[in-house]
């Protein structure tokens, strides 16, 4: 997880507390990415704002399952959910500017770089810059959606 912005959790109780805190939070949706009965990752919609109709998306795939198409499919399904179920107008994300592979993937899904946040997060002993990337609903539906309406 070279480009993850947060420190790992230290214990199961820490994760249980996080789960309890967030299970009823209407501003978040989490989806487990599975291969059969094995969890291979998670995709999340965060900071869901029903007034401005915006939300943040993030995805994590276990490195041992990388390059198998899980991220691509889960990412597109999460975007479909945001636009077609939650009726969001915009989905945005933050990505380390050095994570060129991720930036390329997001751009291939019509996300545009909207700006750079200087020294926005601290990891591995240094401050890192990140891009804010966004996608408007009108640029997603009828172009890249897995769900055809």
Walk through the language-model features, giving the residues of each:
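Conserved small/polar residues in nucleotide/adenosyl-binding loops
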Residues: 147-149
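Short glycine/proline-centered loop/turn elements that form peptide/ligand docking sites
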Residues: 71, 75, 98-102, 119-124
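Conserved acetyl-CoA-binding loop-helix of GNAT-fold acetyltransferases
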Residues: 67-81, 103-108
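Conserved catalytic-core motifs of GNAT/GCN5-like acyltransferases
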Residues: 92-95, 112-129
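Glycine-rich acetyl-CoA-binding "A-motif" of GNAT/NAT acetyltransferases
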Residues: 38-41, 101, 127
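Conserved GNAT acetyl-CoA-binding A-motif
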Residues: 84-94
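Active-site acidic-Proline motif in GNAT/NAT acetyltransferases
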Residues: 62-64, 68, 84, 97-98
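Acetyl-CoA-dependent GNAT
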Residues: 7-66, 136-140
